[in-house]
Amino acid sequence: MLDPAQAKTIIAEELERLRERIIANMRAQNAVASGRTIKSLRVVMTADGGALVSDQQMPFGVLETGRRGGRIPYGFSAIIYQWMQDNGVHATVIPYKTNRPHKYTEQERSDRSMASAIAHTIARSGSRLYRTGGRDTIYSNVIPETVERIENRITGMMSAYVDEMIPINNTEIGGK
């Protein structure tokens, strides 16, 4: 008999496989900044099917298209600065010209200045990925394969069900 639970299991398995492939592609393309997007990817099953969703506020498409220029969130340079600290990226030191006490060390001042410059460039022109035309190697290449695999598995399940229900070789139903 045709089992809807089996179809949902197939969908859940394929969506989990899709999630794993997207994560592998993100790592292979060096598209992991903080790891929050990877942690937020999850498979959600409903009564009608399922979906792969991200809890991040940023649109998921930015992973392939990049961020266009325009308005940036408040504190964007602080976000970039934190990313720089997390990944060990540092600017060339800009020495102070006075000997008075300063709020930041020379390195921290240089890093904050670099983060502000990067934020300004992204706000004005967009990210480098956006300026170079984006890519299609994170999820665009694996979604069609996943849809095809789901179709093939569900179709196989349906054809097995139909084979059970339809008499073969002109045999009558009920054994007559």
Description of each model-found segment:
Residues 1-51:
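Charge-rich, low-complexity N-terminal segments
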Residues 36-176:
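Charged, low-complexity interaction tracts
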